[in-house]
Amino acid sequence: MGCRSFLTPYVDPETGKPKYYGRFNQGVVTINLVDVALSSGGNFEKFWKIFDERLALCHKALQARHQRLMGTPSDAAPILWQYGALARLKKGEKIDKLLFGGYSTISLGYAGLYECVKYMTGKSHTDAGAKPFALSVMQHMNDKCTEWKKAENMDYSLYGTPLESTTYKFAKCLQKRFGIVPGITDKNYITNSYHVHVSEHIDAFTKLKFESEFQKLSPGGAISYVEVPNMQDNLEAVISVLQFIYDNIMYAELNTKSDYCQCCGYDLSLIHISEPTRLALI
């Protein structure tokens, strides 16, 4: 399971009780929403058509991941499948039954909602005029997961992909296919999942409240972040943000700048000033 994966509810048929430990994810395939938007040329009718084509391709790739696991004997990894890390199967028993019925999840990931909406509407998804389109994109992916789940008895769910190195890979592929599109492909990254773009001026509480609406539509996993300055001497503010997270959003965390000077041992925040060889302390 990834760092932001959510386990969907599963009731053990033998005990009739919910079970969370020992479960796992079969894999993730991520759709590049920015590519879908750029491929449509800004035409909404084409967008939805291409969107469905790309989702079908993702579905095919997810099925390939699933088929790769089918037939795996428990002997392939005894600690996982026989000794209780994930299951307690018999020697030689196949893991197939764990791939169906919701015991394990399989995830449709997504990336670049901000750039997708920006290209299609000319506005950020934080804008009231563009937000409905952003939510409709999220809902459409959820609907597809529900459709696949009913047809195959596998727990497909929508997942806010961490991206990490993939953000650079996606960005470079977009630049190669579409060139530099101002505000869309002019950076060597695309925005993670539903996140507010890093360039937007927005306070922590507004950001968390806004993103909570999208996190609800990402039941396979998601996380929101807010960046704060050094807060060692302002713990009340930290607690107020944490309380807001607790009250408004499922999963979020604070990022804070942490610097360390190897000469004097200063360990708060350092910023560059006009002279490039000097640092200022804050």
Which role does the model predict for each range below?
Residues 1-111, 115-119, 228-230, 238-262:
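Structured mid-domain segments that build the active-site/substrate or prosthetic-cofactor binding neighborhood
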Residues 126-145:
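Short secondary-structure subsegments characteristic of cysteine-rich extracellular domains
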Residues 150-192:
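Extended amphipathic alpha-helical segments with heptad-repeat/coiled-coil character used for oligomerization
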Residues 94-100, 120-126, 144-155, 248-250:
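Secondary-structure transition/capping motifs at alpha-helix termini
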Residues 81-87, 124-128, 164-178:
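Short glycine/threonine-rich loop-to-helix capping motif typified by GTGT followed
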